[in-house]
Amino acid sequence: MAIKGPRKHLKRLAAPANWQLPRKVKAFTVRPSPGPHSMDKSLPLLLVVRDVLKYADNAREAKKIIQTGKILIDGLKRKEYKHPAGLMDVLSIPEMDENYLVLFDESGRISLKKTDKADAKLCKIVNKTVIKGGHIQLNLHDGRNQIVKVSDATKAEEDVYKTGDSVLVSIPEQSIVGHVAFGEGKLAYVTGGKHVGEFAKIVEVENRALYSDIVTLENKDGEKFKTVKPYVFIVGQDEPVISM
């Protein structure tokens, strides 16, 4: 019999390897709802509350906590326990004065890091288009689209945003307040591959026509390594522009 509609269940053994989740305790776990992040780069809010933050002993308790609306993602209340919290999302609990940034640890697992501020987040530009009216629409890594109004999109001085750059988005206003261009000398955060979770400076960018560009980086220990451009997330010049 054919499958009708999206899958609603997820076995623990089939869950992404980077989830911090015991595999053999039970058969099933929570499948994140379709949303701003892919399944391998996010965690359902229920797992964040129960398994990462340890604020609940079971799913029932975690659901009750989430349904109170006291947990915010990027400044917005999220009451759906399947909602995905993904890379660079800012998770806030105002009642406890706690803020967390969703990152990858050096084993590639999705983790939360405490942060001092929750007034902005970094977003990577993954694509951009010119829309009706001649304005530029930036497509960001977390599913959001930001429109940049320009008088002429063909002028380089107005079209300053490039694919691979990062923008600083204010929370909760969701407007662009900063821009970090992709290029040599910039500080990057590696989001995939052998060096996932590392901060490193871009040394060289090798442009390729048919494949992803190759980026050479140097970490704090002076070790140089190469990765593909989709794994490179620009976070600042010498230091990250947000607390990471």
Curated annotation (Swiss-Prot):
InterPro entries recorded: Rib_uL2_dom2, Ribosomal_eS4, Ribosomal_eS4_central_region, Ribosomal_eS4_central_sf, Ribosomal_eS4_KOW, Ribosomal_eS4_N, Ribosomal_eS4_N_CS, S4_RNA-bd_sf
All residue ranges annotated as the S4 RNA-binding domain in the record: 43-106
Domain of life where this protein originates: Archaea
MF-aspect GO terms: rRNA binding; structural constituent of ribosome
Gene Ontology biological-process entries: translation
Keywords associated with the record: Ribonucleoprotein, Ribosomal protein, RNA-binding, rRNA-binding
One GO cellular component term noted in the UniProt record for this chain: cytosolic small ribosomal subunit
Xref: HAMAP family: Ribosomal_eS4
Family indicated by similarity: Belongs to the eukaryotic ribosomal protein eS4 family.
NCBIfam families in the cross-refs: PRK04313.1
The protein's name: Small ribosomal subunit protein eS4
Gene assigned in the entry: rps4e
